[in-house]
Amino acid sequence: PQEFNLFADQAQMDIFEQYFYDINQFNRVPGNSTEYADMLTLLEEKIAIFKNIKLLNFVDPYYIKPNELYRLGTLETGFGEVEQVTHKEYLNIKLSPLARPTLKRAVFIDTPQGYRIYPTFTNNVQCHYVRKPRKINWGYNVINDTALYDATTSIDFQLHPSEENNLIVKILALAGIAIKDPAMYQIATAEDNKNIQQEKA
């Protein structure tokens, strides 16, 4: 079960991370007016279950990032959206009387310690973000030297139902590598490549 948990988690993250590369690719191509075939709409639907909004904790002078953060969307105060800038941009902005940050036109810098908002703002700040999928756990109890499934400690996949085949193929490929079966790995990789070609066509 432990190997399955590792394979399952890796496969889920591979599929999840691919969504963002695909969005970038499909943003460069004209959209599709067919309601159920527009790839950007389908990708947004797949990511929707991972979108969160959270009030951030303030530990002077930083707003602490959510632990499960994968990609930041926006930060919002009661005055509206806060614009992200680099440290260098902030140094230039604060010197300009017209561009200097105000409560209604705040800016923030993303640092390893958290988000630094200018001007200093200690009220509620909402973070809109995409979270990481939870780690997969095939929960089990060992009874008479046999691992028996335990639903109370298990964490299931969180991907869109349409990803079931991709998930199986990716887990199969990882298992093929682990048991050193090149045929199983090659079959799974060929199937994965076929799926990718169909999606990108």
Regions found by a protein language model. Give the residues of each.
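Glycine-enriched, solvent-exposed interface loops adjoining structured elements
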Residues: 1-201
